[in-house]
Amino acid sequence: SLIAALISAMAVPAAAQTISDWETKADRSELFALQPETVEFDYKRNERAAYIVVDPVRSYQTMEGFGFALTGGSAEHLIKMTPSARHEILQEMFNPKDGVGFSYIRLTLGSSDLNSFTFSYDDIEEGKEDFKLKHFSLSQDLKDVVPVMQEILGINPDIPVMSSPWSAPVWMKESGNIRGGKLRKDCYQVYAEYFVKYVQAMEKEGIHIDAVTIQNEPLNSRNTPSMPWDPADQIEFVKNNLGPEFEKAGLDTDIIVFDHNCDRPDYALAIYNDPDAARYVTGSAYHHYRGDLSAMKYVYEARPDKKIYFTEQMTTERPGMDRIDIAAPVKRLIIGVTRNWSSNVILWNLAADPLNDPHTDNGGCSMCQGAITIDGDKVTRNLAYYVIAHASKLVPPGSKRIFSTAPGERSISICEDEQHPQMWRTNVIEKADVPDNVTFLTPQGKIVMIVSNDSWSRREVNIQYNGKFARVRLAPGSVATYVWDAE
């Protein structure tokens, strides 16, 4: 409420606070660089400025991490690097202290469209079936995904892992094809057992699967691989097969539904409306190739007992550009996604080569640039790398999103009365003219604010926190992460 913001802003003054400033400038002169100059909070208020009011009393979701998908293609490139070069780039990306601290991994359960070829963990001769899963094997992933994931866990043992299938094994599908075709009803039970075997097999390799989504993009049958799945059938699968099998096996792996675009908030809600299915489901996952991010908030407000996850978005740039157009994706994918209740942000491909390979034919993504481009042992850091770094480095898992004034939001202006010194008056601002931002309180007691200046002019970022004020300037098209001690 406005009263709560006022009380927080007028709290008892404390010692001087210094703001650290990490910036990426559109002209590439600074790429997620800690600025040498610091700014201190003081009691000097700009009467004409609109302030971002920060109020840690009002807190929202707990963040679980920011990261990427370790696709089969990503792992294929990483495993081909020399061990020293691979260790160096993995340390840079995943070390929470000395690197940028990517803090969430999405794996593909079987192949995705960013593999050199398609496969499942139970591929058998055409025309045959394997209801006992005697041929189940992680053999393909053991060549690249598993060893790379093990190396990442050696750097950060606490990184959460979510896995998503693009398709069931071909012999389980009505079409008999890896592209499109629904899961056969008589294969629901064996497919649930297939999920269990995967989670258990990865656990034996030292990789704990924290969550699975039931199907990547269940409304897309044009990808290779892909498998369409409507909510009514997923309800049946969850409540009669997958949920009971996970329970029977004693797995603590979360079950996440939907895993597709923001244009269909009804999908997850349909599953939640069946209590026998909903009891097995932790939350729903979203992409943003269609629809509005507010769909996530809509689902959360309908079912606040269920979590929201953001699991995929391709974020690319042309190689060799003089500019880095970072403001828009940070505004949308870090600020927008977290303000709409997502507990994480996972962007798409971690790594590709200069040709954006590998990918499958007939639907595989030919323009899915990685967060990094790998050419032998040479590494190029791309747009998506810096988008996630602005959050992952400074907003560790366990951080809580807290209130900060959004553009166009109602706010409060606090200033000293002109005729009565040391007396304060407040004004209600109906539509605050502030840059896009989101703010977190970390477990270490830091306030972290991420700001995007998605405009062609310089913005003055005015911050009001705990009775003090600070002013920072942000260049056009630039992004900053500001950090200071909470009080």
Please name every model-derived segment.
Residues A11-P13:
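N-terminal signal peptide c-region/cleavage motif recognized by signal peptidases
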Residues E64-G65, D98-I105, N156-P160, E205-A211, ...:
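Loop/turn elements at helix/coil->beta-strand transitions in domains of secreted/extracellular proteins
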Residues V190-A211, P218-R318:
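Active-site neighborhood of glycoside hydrolase catalytic domains
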Residues F68, G101, V161, V212, ...:
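Conserved, mostly hydrophobic/aromatic
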Residues R473-E487:
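C-terminal beta-strand-rich structural cap/linker in extracellular carbohydrate-active enzymes
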Residues L31-I209, N240:
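N-terminal catalytic cores of secreted or lumenal carbohydrate-active enzymes
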Residues K307-K393, I402-P407, S413:
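Aromatic/acidic polysaccharide-binding cleft in carbohydrate-active enzymes
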Residues K393, G398, S404-N466, G477:
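Carbohydrate-binding surface patches
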